[in-house]
């Protein structure tokens, strides 16, 4: 599995926990690592260069959570007849993360959208894939 795809999966898990628990995203990241590294000797410490840290996952989770209000407004403006709070939590966070990543402009939008659709196939359903594709396409086109 490609490293970036795995990082996106991990970021989605962190964002799901953050959204459901309303805890700070740093706490959700720490909880994720606690679960991932059940053996204390494998656990990353506070050093950013320690093996085992997933810097891309952390950047996606932190950046998405920091920009959530702006991103949510963009989602709402493109989703006709769908209030944000009525969207499934997984779908909402796939959208948030993809829109955040597109705003960074480091990865081509087509790649970000394809990755988001793959996450939707893994963690949601086919109806969600179509819905997410439509929203992301509309956001990308402006």
Predicted regions and their residues:
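N-terminal interaction/assembly modules
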Residues: 1-129, 133-142
């Amino acid at each position: 599995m490609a490293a970036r795809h795995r990082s996106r999966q991990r970021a989605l898990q962190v964002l799901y926990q953050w959204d459901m628990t309303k805890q700070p995203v740093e706490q959700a990241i720490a909880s994720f690592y606690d679960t991932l590294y059940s053996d204390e000797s494998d656990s990353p410490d506070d050093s950013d260069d320690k093996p085992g840290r997933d810097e891309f996952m952390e950047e996606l989770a932190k950046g998405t959570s920091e920009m959530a209000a702006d991103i949510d407004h963009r989602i709402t403006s493109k989703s006709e007849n769908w209030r944000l709070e009525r969207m499934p939590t997984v779908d909402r966070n796939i959208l948030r993360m993809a829109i955040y990543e597109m705003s960074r402009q480091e990865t081509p939008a087509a790649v970000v959208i394809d990755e988001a659709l793959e996450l939707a196939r893994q963690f949601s359903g086919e109806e969600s894939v179509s819905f997410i594709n439509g929203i992301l396409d509309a956001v990308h086109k402006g």
